[in-house]
Regions:
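RNA pseudouridine synthases
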Residues: 1-163
């Protein structure tokens, strides 16, 4: 018996699919993968989608190549084979696959900008926080951005991550 009825999978927006990869839209506030909360995640939903669409018995392999934070919506790439997972993961490591975001921010923003900070995970709050470079667990985080439009004290920015 399938874990999810088909009507619950209808909100899965698959943008591209072949024998090696599947690209789908992760809605904002959905997890990328299962966690201890038990909340809905796109990885589990897509495995069920593949199981139903292709009438696959048993467990379905789907490799998680990257994640998006829970509040973030956008395209995610998943590997349908272990070989594709290995190759896509290597592309992510070598920065051959870009990670770009659009965001709306308040306040003044330069036309082009770079942010360099150090981040560490707060396990208790399950969030990442800015910290000093010498703090235990600190990791370098760099991004560049460009302001695309301004209106009423807000700015639409295109962001490109240089680091994970």
């Amino acid at each position: 018996m399938n874990e999810f009825p088909l009507h619950q999978l209808a909100n899965i927006d698959v943008q591209y699919e072949d024998n090696h990869v599947i690209v789908a839209v992760k809605p904002p506030n959905m997890l990328s993968q299962a966690d201890k909360t038990g909340d809905t995640d796109i990885l589990t939903q897509l495995k069920e989608y593949i199981k139903i669409k292709y009438n696959k018995p048993g467990a379905v392999y789907l490799g998680l190549v990257h994640r998006l934070d829970r509040p973030v919506g956008g395209l995610m790439v998943f590997a349908r084979t272990s070989k594709a997972a290995s190759r896509l993961s290597a592309q992510m490591r070598e920065h051959e696959m870009g990670r770009e975001y659009l965001c709306v921010v308040e306040g003044r923003v330069k036309d082009r900008f770079t942010c360099i900070d150090y981040l560490k995970k707060n396990e208790y709050l399950n969030k990442v926080e800015i910290c000093d470079a010498d703090e235990k667990g600190a990791q370098l985080a760099m991004l560049s951005g460009e302001c695309l439009a301004r209106k009423n004290g807000t700015a639409l920015c295109a962001i490109r991550l240089q680091t994970g």
